[in-house]
Each structure stands twice: as C-alpha cells, then as structure tokens.
Amino acid sequence: MEQDKYLTVAAITKYIEKKFEVDPYMKQVFVRGEISNLKQPASGHLYFTVKDEFAMLRSVMFHKAVQKIGFVPEDGMNVLVTGRIGVFTKAGRYQFYAEHMEPDGVGALYIQLEQLKAQLEKEGLFAETHKKVLPSFPSKVAVVTSKTGAAVRDILTTIHRRMPSVEVIVYPTIVQGEKAAQKIVENIGKINQRNDIDVMIIGRGGGSLEELWAFNEEPVVRAVYDSDVPVISAVGHETDFALSDFSADVRAATPTAAAELAVPDYRDLEERLAERKYRLLAVTRQALERKERSLEQLKQHLILNGPKHQLEQQMERTDYFSERLNNAFSKQIFVKQTAFDRLNDRLHYYHPNKEIELQKEQMTLHLQALDKAMKQLLKDKQQSFFRQVDALEHLSPLSLLKRGFGVTYKENTLVKSVQELEVGDNIQVKMQGGHIDALITAKEEDISGN
C-alpha cells in the first residue's frame, strides 16, 4: 500500500499538463523577447527560444501559423509573440506554443519592408527591362489618390498649367489604413479595364512609414507591376520611398514631379516646334539653292551641247559650203565666158557662120549641163544637211524627253546603269516640262547584263 502514493513520470507530467490547460493565464499569453536558436526543419515548423536578459522560453510555431506571418524571423530579432503555455511530455518540459508573431517596435516595419523588397526584387518585379516608356503626348491621365489631400490639388494644378488640353480623371481612394491597399488595387484594376487611359499616377503626400504603408503592401506592388497602363508612383516627399516606386515604370519624388513627368509643357513644345520650323526652312532653302545651281549648270550644258548649238554649227558649215559652191559656179561661168569670148573673137576673125552656130549650141548644152549639175549638187548638199540635222535632233536629250523618256541623275551626276543605284537612294529624273525627285524602293537588274 505504501507504493500507491508514488506516481509514474507520465502521470505527474500529465497532471502538470492539465494544470497548464486549465490555468486561464496560460491559455493566451503575450510574450516580448529576442529570438535565438531558431531552426526550421523540412516540416516547416519553427523551433526557437524567446529570451530576455533574465530568462528564456522554449517555443514552437507550427507550419500553419508560420504561413500567416508577414516576415521571416531571424536570430536576434525582437518580436511580439502570442500563444499558449503547454507541456511537451516526451521531454518533460513546458514550452510556449506560438500562434502569432510580429516584429517588435517601429523597426519591425522596416524589417518587414526590407524582407518583402528582397523577395519581390528576386522575382524580378523591379527589373528595368519590364518598365514601359511613358507616352510623349498623353490625352488622358488617371490619378489614384485621396480626393481631399494636397497631392491631388498639386497634380491637377500642374497638369492644367503645363498642358490644359489633357483630361485628368481622378479615382478617389483612401491612402492609409487597413482597407487602403485593397482600394488602391481596385482602382488600378478599373483603370486597366479602360482602353483610353494613356498614363496613371498613384501616390499621396508625405507621412510616416505607417501612414505610407499601403503603398508597401504586396498586392499594391504587384498590381502596379502587372498594369498595362504605364504607372508613375509618387508617394510622400522626396526623401520618402515605397515599394510601389520600385515596381512602377517611373518613380517621381513628389506628386507635382509626377504631373511634370506625365505631360509635356506646351510652352516647351512651342519653342521646339519653332526651332524645328526654322531648321526645316533653312534645310529647304539650302536644297532649293543646290537645285537652282544644278539647273543653271544643266542650262549651260544644253546651251553648249544642245541641238540649237549643233544646228548653228551646221548652218555655219552650210554657209561655208554654199559660198564655196557659189565661188566654184562663178569660176566655171567665168571660164566658160572666157572660152565663149575667145570663140567669139575667132568667129569674128574667121566669120564661119556654121561654126558659130555649132559653138553656140555646144555652149548652150554646156551651160544647161553645168546649171543642172550645180542645181543637183546644191540639192544633194541640202538633203545631206537636213539628214544631219534630223540625226542631231534624234540624238538630242531633249528629243528623247519629248518622246516620253527621262534622264536620271543621282547627286547631280548622270546615271548610265541600274548598277549605279541602290535601294534607298534619292534620284532626280528630268522629263519633258520639268523634273521629279524619287526614292529607290526596289531594284531589279537585267540578268542578261544589258
């Protein structure tokens, strides 16, 4: 009977376990301390110790609870842990069963922020290759911000001043608090459902880390990254930053700066337009002067080598041959007249009437033959001259132009073969009545080589 008062190890351990279970102070315990001896096996559970300078508490957090915490616990991290105290019977010790954990103090938000930033950066959400180019001349700008804050006033004022023609559509949203992230994501989704928004601005004015936190939450950062509409993120003041700044296509230091990035200043555009107009006029004037010089050179070339000049030369040659022909004809007449005079003298000397008549007849025949020969020679010379003129007319470039042909120049140089041209060359084609400028878009060479 004496031995009935002894309890087994299991029994006393079970008793102690029951004591912890029924103790209301042990059912929900709030513990603050530093993590040490952290381990996470393949099961996904966390095994660690929560300690302070006076004591330590063995702790465990099961996998289901681990999945709900928004950061990665590390040794040396100060945390706030909620859970219950129980007994691990196999080891015969009490331990803390953690059900919720969060970093301790304001530094906890920075830890959570840095850990989420590292995770999203590893996934590629901040990569420059993903970022879209902002449109140069947007017609509609969407703004996701508070409808009562200074940010929306700054954005509207700046856009209206820089480009009054741009339509601004404000999507009012709460920018801090528990529901802020959800509302921001909803508005980004609404904007992407439209097909007329060119660029959107999301952001708010300055504030503390807690007040800006909605723009650090993962759903917002991912919605910005997934947006088909280019996004400008402008959260807080110049020294502030949010994770939405990194996933956005462009980060602006302030809401005013975001508006300046979203739309151009019409005064700058007017100056640029005037400058380009001046440059275009200068280039056009230079091109016109070059064409005028080229035309003048072509005129001089035609004057020296054209059919008119050739005709004048042929006319000079005709006059020269006509003069020679007249001289030869006059000489023949003179010779015949001299012979006639001699015969006439002889006739007077001998008075042979029959001989005189015979000589007169011969003289007449000779004169007729000579006249006929001279006329035929002159006719032959004229026909030859006109044939040469016709040949010159056919060889003249202007004659080719009249028949529908064109003369092609490249940089004021005559083009004689298609092999001298390449696709993309600018050419000038001289035609009857003027010329045209053309661009070579295709080229096909004759396979025969002709």
Curated annotation (Swiss-Prot):
Catalytic activity of the protein: Exonucleolytic cleavage in either 5'- to 3'- or 3'- to 5'-direction to yield nucleoside 5'-phosphates
Keyword terms of this UniProt record: Cytoplasm, Exonuclease, Hydrolase, Nuclease
GO biological process, one term: DNA catabolic process
GO terms under cellular component: cytoplasm; exodeoxyribonuclease VII complex
Compartmental location: Cytoplasm
Pfam family, one: tRNA_anti_2
Family recorded in the similarity comment: Belongs to the XseA family.
Protein's job: Bidirectionally degrades single-stranded DNA into large acid-insoluble oligonucleotides, which are then degraded further into small acid-soluble oligonucleotides.
Annotated protein name in UniProt: Exodeoxyribonuclease 7 large subunit
Organism annotation: Listeria monocytogenes serovar 1/2a (strain ATCC BAA-679 / EGD-e)
